[in-house]
Amino acid sequence: MASMLGTEKYGEISYFISIAILASTIALLGMSTTVIVYTSKGVKIQSTAYLSGIISAITTSIILFYIFINDVGISIYIFGFVTFTLITSNYLGQKLYSKYSKINIIQKILLVIFAVGFYHLMGLEGIILGIGISFILFFGIIIKSFKEMKIDYSIFRSRYKFILNSFLLDLTRASSGSVDKLIIAPLLGFALLGNYQLGIQYIALLHIVPGIVFKYVLPEASRG
């Protein structure tokens, strides 16, 4: 992607994706970890968590839509990211690792196809839009879950402290990976941010294995 865009445009797209990721994390309301942990315990929390995430994502998307002067790409990214994250969290909680792997691989393939395709049609805005669409295509899985289990907000009452802690933890993680880019871009420009982001990508590779281990251990430990 960087070789196709050049460092300045790559920095610009990294800046807007960082905004979208941070906003998406806020919109998730800590539901990702909550779904993983309580689904692994057999609690039927999915539909309630999905509805909460959808309402929050729509609200956040509308706010960002007007902030960025009717840029629908970021809004679609937020809604898609939230719903896709909740779907994969459910798979992890149920220990459906094969489904989790397949859906992630398919999404990554779709991401490349749509991001590159929409870039050639629309420019930089098309990349974020393409990524968002690659997430949203799996929304039907959430619709199906609404038919299989009822929405019950009483489930949250005794678990609000855990949900709050999960939200703060997720927000801290997202901030550590996004705030630096939000500072660098306005102060030093997109070109420098592009070079900075390229360097960060190599460091991110080192965190892939620990991240996979964490996602496997969390539902296992929650059951124990």
Model regions: which residues?
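Membrane-interface alpha-helices at helix entry/exit sites of multi-pass transporters
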Residues: 12, 44-55
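Helix-loop junctions and terminal segments of transmembrane helices
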Residues: 25-43, 203-224
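Extracellular/periplasmic helix-loop-helix junction of adjacent transmembrane segments
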Residues: 2-22
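Transmembrane helical elements of multi-pass membrane transporters/channels
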Residues: 107, 124-138, 142, 154-219
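Alpha-helical transmembrane segments and their lipid-water interface positions
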Residues: 24-28, 32, 60-64, 115, ...
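Hydrophobic transmembrane helix module of multi-pass membrane transport proteins
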Residues: 52-169
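Residues that define the loop-to-transmembrane-helix transition and helix capping
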Residues: 8-11, 47, 98, 124-125, ...
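Helix-loop interface residues and adjacent transmembrane-helix termini in multi-pass membrane transporters
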Residues: 4-7, 93-94, 121, 187-190
